[in-house]
UniProtKB/Swiss-Prot annotation:
Listed name of the protein: Protein GrpE
Keywords tagged on the record: Chaperone, Cytoplasm, Stress response
GO cellular component: cytoplasm
Role summary: Participates actively in the response to hyperosmotic and heat shock by preventing the aggregation of stress-denatured proteins, in association with DnaK and GrpE. It is the nucleotide exchange factor for DnaK and may function as a thermosensor. Unfolded proteins bind initially to DnaJ; upon interaction with the DnaJ-bound protein, DnaK hydrolyzes its bound ATP, resulting in the formation of a stable complex. GrpE releases ADP from DnaK; ATP binding to DnaK triggers the release of the substrate protein, thus completing the reaction cycle.
Region (Disordered): 1-65
The encoding gene: grpE
Biased composition (Basic and acidic residues): 55-65
Coiled-coil features, chain-numbered ranges: none
Complexes and interactors: Homodimer.
InterPro entries for the chain: GrpE, GrpE_coiled_coil, GrpE_head
Entry-linked PANTHER family: GRPE PROTEIN (PTHR21237), GRPE PROTEIN HOMOLOG, MITOCHONDRIAL (PTHR21237:SF23)
Taxonomic source organism: Corynebacterium efficiens (strain DSM 44549 / YS-314 / AJ 12310 / JCM 11189 / NBRC 100395)
Subcellular location: Cytoplasm
Molecular function via GO: adenyl-nucleotide exchange factor activity; protein homodimerization activity; protein-folding chaperone binding; unfolded protein binding
Family assignment from sequence similarity: Belongs to the GrpE family.
Length: 237
């Protein structure tokens, strides 16, 4: 081959390239222009983006009664709290007021009844206690009556006119009198079979009196502890 391709001395010279070649400075300009064009289109896409139909559909599908249900649940919780705290301003609580007043009246009546029963119990207990004490005292007095009988016999024989025995008899009788021990049975008193024990009846008429008192009778606190032993006779004319 006689023809051969000869490489230029400066291959990068624009004159050595073909007509369609691009100058290096033009390459940089083309790159910058492409970047501007791409960036502007992306911003325009963002600005012109239409609403997402899926999101709109979710917003349209919300239950319109959801807020009402939540408010109802919240009110129920508040009502429970009011009930625990004893707040009674609802019509139902106000309607229970007559029932509460009736219960209060019933409890008051029960308290009054129990109070009256307790007062009666105390009075009954005090009476029983006093009765037991009187019974014990009357038992002691009954054992002292023979001493009184001996003092009466000594007085009939004139042994209590003076001396230490008379002083003892006076103190002993005064002590029993202070204990509400009372002697009865004096000649001339009307005969009473309830308190007098007759060993002989010398009367001839319907009216009977005590002729001779063989042994005096005694009462303690108006309670008979021993009958008087007597002989019945007619009243003196």
């Amino acid at each position: 081959m006689t023809d051969s391709y000869k490489l230029p001395d400066n291959p990068g010279d624009p004159d050595a390239t073909d007509d369609e070649g691009i100058h290096p400075d033009e390459v940089e300009n083309l790159i910058e222009e492409a970047e501007r064009t791409q960036g502007g289109s992306e911003d325009d896409d963002l600005l012109t983006t239409e609403p997402d139909p899926v999101v709109d559909a979710r917003e349209d599908d919300r239950d319109p009664t959801l807020e009402e249900d939540l408010e109802g649940d919240l009110q129920a919780v508040l009502d429970d709290i009011d009930a625990e705290l004893g707040v009674a301003d609802t019509p139902e609580a106000t309607g229970d007021l007559p029932t509460t007043e009736a219960q209060l009246a019933e409890r008051t009546e029960d308290l009054q009844r129990v109070t009256a029963e307790y007062a009666n119990y105390r009075r009954r207990t005090e009476r029983e206690r006093a009765g037991i004490i009187d019974t014990a005292k009357s038992g002691v007095v009954s054992k002292l009556l023979p001493i009184l009988d001996d003092l009466d016999l000594a007085e009939q024989h004139g042994d209590l006119e003076e001396g230490p025995l008379k002083a003892f008899a006076d103190k002993f009788r005064n002590t029993l009198t202070g204990l509400k021990v009372e002697a009865f049975g004096v000649p001339g008193d009307t005969f009473d079979p309830e308190i007098h024990e007759a060993v002989q009846d010398l009367s001839e008429g319907d009216t009977k009196v005590l002729g001779t008192v063989l042994r005096k009778g005694y009462r303690f606190n108006d309670k008979l502890i021993r009958n008087a032993m007597v002989i019945i006779a007619d009243p003196e004319k």
